[in-house]
Structures are given as C-alpha cells and as structure tokens.
C-alpha cells in the first residue's frame, strides 16, 4: 500500500526519486552531492530508494563540444553514450561518502511494456534493493528511438514506481511545486494538494521543457497521475528541496493516490 498522505512520507519504506537533466548537469552539476545526501539520509533510516536520473545527453554535450542539445538522433545517442558513464561516475563518487553502491539500470518504456522484459527488470531491481544498493535508472538513450525524441523520464519514473510497488514517487524539477499557471506569470497560485481524480480544471499547465531536457509540467502531471492510479503517493517539488521533501516537510504539490 502506498503512502496515503504527506504525513507518511518520512516513514515511506520504498521510494522512487526522479531528477531531471537541468537539475544535475552543466552549472547545476554540483546539486548531485546534496541530492545524494538526502537519498543517503532516507537510506540510513531503512528506506529502499530507486533513483531515476535523466542527464546522459546533457552531461555528454560538453565532451562533444556542444553548447545546445543536438537535434539529430545520432548525435543525441553519441552524447548519451559518453554522458551516461560520466553521470554514473559522479553519482558513485558522491555515494562513496556513505558507503552506498550504485547499480546502473538502463531501460526504455518499451522494456516495461513487454512482459518478459518487465519481469527481468523487476527481478533485477528487487535484487538490487535487497542488497541495499541504489539502483540508478535512466532511459537507454543510446539505443532508444521514439523515446529519445518524444519520451521523458517522468513517465519512466512512474512506470518504475509501479514496477517496484513504491510507496512514494518524488518528482524533482527546477520548480518548487505545481502552479495554477506558469509561476513567473502574475497571479500564479501554488497548488498544495491534488485529490485523486482531480482534472485540474482551470489550471494552465505549460508543456515547455528546459533546453537540455524533454520534460515539463505536462509530463510531470501525467506521470503523477499514472503513479497515483497504481496507489503510489506522489510529491512534486524542486531538487533544491529534496532533503525537506524526504524528511516530510510541507513542500511542493502532493498528488493523493487511489485509496
């Protein structure tokens, strides 16, 4: 049974944390350490944590001397091939401070749609968690086609949350919560709670992602609904507030799960 309300966040036994490209690459690469600090704190109190991390393409771009996200698939795949190894190294370097070992898991949404692939992924994930390791999941951008162009790791995170029967899905971004309209616009109101089945009528959800990522508010709301439908509580907040979020502080937007 998932976490039914905010009150249960601090005691959630199994947590999926999703972080986006713009939060941990480029000038924000330094945010990996505080993200790991928060995950390690949850791990230390007994929680099992899965990290779904975007960022392979964005991390690889400087090594290919690219200032902007490449438009063509082959260059995206090349950037991902370089960036994924650098990204996992950075995570492990930070995790070493806590004696936690990362296990890299590369998936596509299609992998989780095929029953045999899904079963294999589930078995591997359960074993990693049982060994008290940290599965670090990313979309397999080097071989993905449709997903690399139009997919997003928000949806992948929701599917992973369903795969491991997570109590909590924590969706991290550059914005601290869901707002009634783009937060930079006058009159934007922070939404603290979304009841299960709420269609969010009157809420203007922009679809534009960042320059290095593919997600935005639309993908996060869709992912939150997908996870909530399966009984997983979802909290949407900023990467800067990850420690407070995992400690149960009243931050972000809570999506109540199906009861």
From Swiss-Prot:
Gene Ontology annotations for the cellular component aspect, listed alphabetically: cytosol
Annotated keywords: Amino-acid biosynthesis, ATP-binding, Cytoplasm, Kinase, Nucleotide-binding, Proline biosynthesis, Transferase
Binding positions for substrate per the UniProt entry: 54, 141, 153
Chief location bin: cytoplasm
Reaction(s) this enzyme catalyzes, per UniProt: L-glutamate + ATP = L-glutamyl 5-phosphate + ADP
One MF annotation (Gene Ontology) recorded for this entry: ATP binding
Keyword flag Ribosomal protein: no
InterPro entries referenced in this protein's UniProt entry, alphabetically: AceGlu_kinase-like_sf (IPR036393), Asp/Glu/Uridylate_kinase (IPR001048), Glu/AcGlu_kinase (IPR001057), Glu_5kinase (IPR011529), Glu_5kinase/COase_Synthase (IPR005715)
Residues the entry annotates as binding ATP: 18, 173-174
Pathway(s) this gene product operates in, as recorded in its UniProt entry: Amino-acid biosynthesis; L-proline biosynthesis; L-glutamate 5-semialdehyde from L-glutamate: step 1/2
Family statement drawn from the similarity comment of this UniProt entry: Belongs to the glutamate 5-kinase family.
This protein's name: Glutamate 5-kinase
């Amino acid at each position: 049974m998932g976490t039914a309300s905010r009150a249960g966040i601090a005691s959630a036994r199994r947590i999926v944390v999703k972080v986006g490209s713009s939060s941990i690459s480029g000038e924000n690469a330094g945010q990996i350490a505080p993200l790991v600090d928060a995950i390690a704190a949850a791990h230390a109190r007994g929680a099992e944590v899965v990290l779904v991390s975007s960022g392979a393409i964005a991390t690889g771009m400087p090594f290919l001397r690219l200032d902007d996200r490449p438009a063509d698939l082959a260059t995206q795949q090349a950037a991902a091939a370089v960036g994924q190894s650098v990204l996992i190294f950075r995570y492990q370097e930070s995790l070493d401070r806590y004696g936690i070992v990362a296990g890299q898991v590369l998936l596509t949404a299609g992998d989780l749609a095929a029953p045999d692939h899904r079963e294999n992924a589930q078995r591997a994930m359960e074993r990693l968690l049982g060994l008290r390791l940290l599965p670090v999941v990313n979309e397999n951008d080097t071989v993905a086609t449709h997903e690399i162009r139009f997919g997003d790791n928000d949806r992948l995170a929701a599917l992973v949350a369903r795969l491991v029967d997570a109590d909590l899905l924590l969706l991290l971004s550059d914005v601290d919560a869901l707002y009634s309209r783009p937060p930079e616009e006058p009159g934007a109101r922070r939404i603290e709670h979304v009841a299960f089945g709420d269609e969010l009528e009157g809420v203007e959800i922009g679809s534009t992602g960042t320059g290095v990522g593919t997600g935005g508010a639309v993908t996060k709301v869709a992912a939150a609904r997908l996870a909530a439908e399966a009984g997983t509580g979802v909290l949407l907040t900023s990467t800067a507030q990850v420690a407070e979020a995992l400690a149960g502080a009243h931050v972000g937007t809570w999506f109540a799960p199906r009861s």
